[in-house]
Amino acid sequence: MTTPNKGNKALKVKREPGENGTSLTDEELVTMSVRELNQHLRGLSKEEIIQLKQRRRTLKNRGYAASCRVKRVTQKEELEKQKAELQQEVEKLASENASMKMELDALRSKYEALQNFARTVARSPVTPVRGPLTSSMGPLVPGKVATTSVITIVKSKTDARS
């Protein structure tokens, strides 16, 4: 005979003396092989066999559900970790992007300053200044300026922005 005890999680399946065993716990019922289960079921009534098999199926499903929950929680934690890492990377890339935009703007304004300076020099001819360096530099040609003066202008404009 079977005696289900619904209040106790470790349900014991009791048998009549003289059968294959005296009792089975939930853990034993779940962990035993089908062959072992069939040996224990010999001599029991059809109703008791159905109850034991149903109980075993229920317990196994409960175990599968528990492992599924653990797996789901683990996957959720892993996904949250990946999400946090990706958010950090997005923030880092956004910061790099902003920095590069600022650098690009600075380079663009330097470029525009150089263009404006080149236009100014091209429109108005430079009159040579007579001094000790004039003869060594050669004749000054309109539209051509020494590189150092261009760099000086660009640097001074950049320093003014800082």
Curated annotation (Swiss-Prot):
InterPro entries: bZIP (IPR004827), bZIP_Maf (IPR004826), bZIP_sf (IPR046347), TF_DNA-bd_sf (IPR008917), Transcription_factor_Maf_fam (IPR024874). One of its GO terms (cellular component) is nucleus. GO terms for molecular function: DNA-binding transcription factor activity, RNA polymerase II-specific; RNA polymerase II cis-regulatory region sequence-specific DNA binding. It is found in: Nucleus. The keyword Ion transport does not apply. Sumoylation at Lys-14 is required for active transcriptional repression. Keywords: DNA-binding, Isopeptide bond, Nucleus, Repressor, Transcription, Transcription regulation, Ubl conjugation. Residues 51-114 form the bZIP domain. It comes from the Eukaryota. Residues 53-76 are annotated as: Basic motif. SUPFAM superfamilies: A DNA-binding domain in eukaryotic transcription factors, Leucine zipper domain. GO terms for biological process: regulation of epidermal cell differentiation; regulation of transcription by RNA polymerase II. There is a cross-link at K14 (Glycyl lysine isopeptide (Lys-Gly) (interchain with G-Cter in SUMO)). Homodimer or heterodimer. Belongs to the bZIP family. Maf subfamily. Since they lack a putative transactivation domain, the small Mafs behave as transcriptional repressors when they dimerize among themselves. However, they seem to serve as transcriptional activators by dimerizing with other (usually larger) basic-zipper proteins and recruiting them to specific DNA-binding sites. Small Maf proteins heterodimerize with Fos and may act as competitive repressors of the NF-E2 transcription factor. Transcription factor, component of erythroid-specific transcription factor NF-E2. May be involved in signal transduction of extracellular H(+). This is Transcription factor MafG. It comes from Gallus gallus (Chicken).
